[in-house]
Each structure stands twice: as C-alpha cells, then as structure tokens.
C-alpha cells in the first residue's frame, strides 16, 4: 500500500492549544496516521503519513477550523511508513529561533513562487534588475546534501544561530534581492520576517521551500538533493528518495560512497562517528 507523506505549517495565533492537542491526537490515532504535530502560540507545524483516505479525511477535518482552512500541505509518496509513532506536542515556538515570537496577526513575509524564482535565476536578476541572493537558512549538514547554485549559507549548526549570522553579514545583502529558502518553508518564512525586522530592505521567502520548488519546476539551478527529517534522509528533484542516508548514532549524513565503508553499520555507526561517544551509545 502506498503511503502519502504530507508536511504543512502556518503562522497563526493559537490560544486554545490545551483543547487542540488532545483533539488532534485522537483524530490522527483513530485514522491510523503517524508523524508529529507541533502546536505553539505562533502556529502549527506538522508532518504526517498514512493511507490516502486517512490523510484526506484528516485534512478535511482540519480545514473545517477557519484558522487552518487555507493550509495546503506538500505531498510525496513512499512504499513504507516513515514514522514510528503519532505525537502532538505543545511548544514555545513551532520552529526555534529564540527571538521574540512571530506575530501572525501582523502578516507574513513577502514570498516568491517557484516559477517566478526560476525566471529570476534564468535571467540573472529580479524583475527590477537587482541581483538575487539565494540565502540558505538550513543547518550545515542539510546544506551538504544539496542547495541552490551560488547560494549563501552561514554554516550554522541550528536555526537559533541564524539571527547572529545575519547580523554579522547584513552589509553584504545591501542593494540586493534576498530570497531565503529551506526545506518546506517554515524556517525561511521566519528568517525573512526576522531580516525585515532588522532592516534588510528587500527580502522574500521561497513559497513552499525547496520541496515545492522541486514539485513545480524541478531541479533547475539546484545542485544535489534535499535533506528531509525522516527515514528517507534525502529527496531528489523528482521527489524520490535519493542516495544519502543518515547515521542514527551521530546524525551525520552518509553519502553513497561512505555507505560502502565497513564502518557503516545501519543504526550503529558510520565513518563520521566510529569509535566516538555517539557510536558507543548507539
């Protein structure tokens, strides 16, 4: 049976998380769905997988709440269930930046659709002639799997380091059109809002992130694959599982070449961690 994998988020003010959390958990468990839903005062972030009918039924139920009526999840298919359990968690933020919380009622950051971004990249500038800077907001190990051509990345280990990195490089963004991007849109939206707040003049988020770009225009101007946070590890521009795997001892990304090493034992070790504390604890 084919499994439908969806991811979606929305920055929207939520003041009834104590009611939403058990209701969502009950609905998902009854439908046989697995994955994670994060709820915070600033919104919702979810990754779910299950049969088509179960996914569609849950989304119909979710859309009945006016706050979530416009959520359009990104989809991919797999032969296996990528998640082991169903979790619904209450958090301070749906994506941790450790900065003042996003205020959903004040609106989202400007966005650029994948087809429009491809046109900008094809022509070498935006529609007003400004150079376009692709700014990767993801962690360093994700960037290593693949990113846009000539993208700027700040070698951060976690998203909460992004504000400090932007502050150090803000002058380099002056006079340019900055397009922040990430896997599915949530980090680049929050990053774009933060950059606006600190005075970066012309900033957009890539609508739907890399996965939506793959879905709508393919891999043009992109090199490599896109890291995803489930057993598939990486998807290619056709949204198919790619070669890299993740070591579940140290969380490093293991390339197809590294998987040939005798040090690579699924779930136990890889060339990055063999003999380390991470490997010993696995």
Curated annotation (Swiss-Prot):
Disulfide bonds: none annotated. Signal peptide: none annotated. SMART domains: RHOD. The active site is at residue 182. It catalyses: uridine(34) in tRNA + AH2 + O2 = 5-hydroxyuridine(34) in tRNA + A + H2O. GO terms for biological process: tRNA modification. Catalyzes oxygen-dependent 5-hydroxyuridine (ho5U) modification at position 34 in tRNAs. This is tRNA uridine(34) hydroxylase. It comes from Cupriavidus necator (strain ATCC 17699 / DSM 428 / KCTC 22496 / NCIMB 10442 / H16 / Stanier 337).
């Amino acid at each position: 049976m084919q499994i439908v994998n969806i991811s979606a988020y929305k920055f929207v003010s939520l003041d009834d998380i104590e009611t939403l959390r058990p209701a969502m958990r009950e609905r998902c468990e009854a439908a046989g769905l697995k994955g994670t839903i994060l709820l915070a005062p600033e919104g919702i972030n979810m990754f779910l997988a299950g049969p088509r009918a179960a996914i569609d039924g849950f989304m119909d139920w979710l859309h009945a709440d006016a706050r979530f009526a416009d959520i359009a999840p990104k989809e991919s298919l797999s032969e296996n269930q990528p998640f082991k359990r169903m979790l619904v968690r209450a958090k301070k933020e749906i994506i941790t930046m450790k900065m003042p919380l996003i205020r959903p009622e004040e609106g989202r950051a400007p966005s650029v659709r994948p087809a429009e971004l491809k046109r900008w990249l094809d022509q070498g500038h935006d529609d007003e002639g400004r150079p376009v800077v692709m700014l990767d907001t993801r962690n360093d190990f994700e960037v290593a799997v693949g990113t846009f051509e000539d993208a700027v990345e700040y070698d951060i280990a976690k998203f909460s380091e992004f504000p400090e990195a932007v502050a150090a490089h803000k002058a380099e963004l002056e006079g340019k059109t900055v397009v922040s991007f990430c896997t599915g849109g949530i980090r680049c939206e929050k990053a774009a809002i933060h950059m606006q707040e600190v005075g970066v003049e012309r900033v957009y988020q890539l609508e739907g992130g890399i996965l939506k770009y793959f879905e709508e225009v393919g891999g043009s101007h992109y090199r490599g694959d896109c890291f995803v946070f489930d057993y598939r590890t990486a998807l290619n521009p056709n949204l198919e599982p790619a070669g890299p795997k993740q070591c579940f001892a140290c969380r490093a990304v293991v390339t197809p070449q590294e998987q040939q090493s005798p040090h690579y034992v699924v779930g136990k070790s890889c060339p990055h961690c063999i003999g380390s504390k991470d490997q010993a604890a696995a």
